[in-house]
Amino acid sequence: MTNSIFFFFICGETLPPDNIHAVSVSMPTLQDIIDYEEQTPEILEKITIAYPRFVMHPYLKILAKFIKEKYKINDNYEVVLLSSQKAVKAVSNKYFIHNKIDINEPFGVILVQNGTTQLNKVLKFIQHVGYNLSSRLAQEYLFKEGLIDTKHIEGYEDEKTAYNTLTKTLAIAYNQPQKNVCLTPSGMNAVYCAL
């Protein structure tokens, strides 16, 4: 195939490449996908960033550790970071979590006892409803606290240029007039944003 728009990316490379906030990751071979589904240690070493519902972002790991130390939280509890206080209320009410310490942060935090089925249920619930704290908000917090040295700066295309490029490409791919292409948000919007 000549003039292909597809390139080979090594397993674990973020898509878009070199973007700490990427929501997709390269798994170029069928074996990579099988290893990921089976959660082999080798693949988990390679894939440190992926779709946030499936892989905890490195910034969230750093932030959870910081919150645990800042509030002197017992090791019997897992710090679970959420997108908002509204998310805290929803998760707390559903799973009867009523933290005994006051945590005052610009995002949601709950403490769930380690080694319990409740922790797994809470994490699954958060995964499916999308209550995860964003890596960009975590980055801002970590930078302000001096826990990371730099912030990843993302380049953005002009909105009209991006829209025209996408609709034109889709129109050609589907052999349709560009006016027939309509972009709408969906669960897969992260994939087309990555490409």
Which residue stretches match the model-derived regions?
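Buried hydrophobic packing segments
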Residues: 190-195
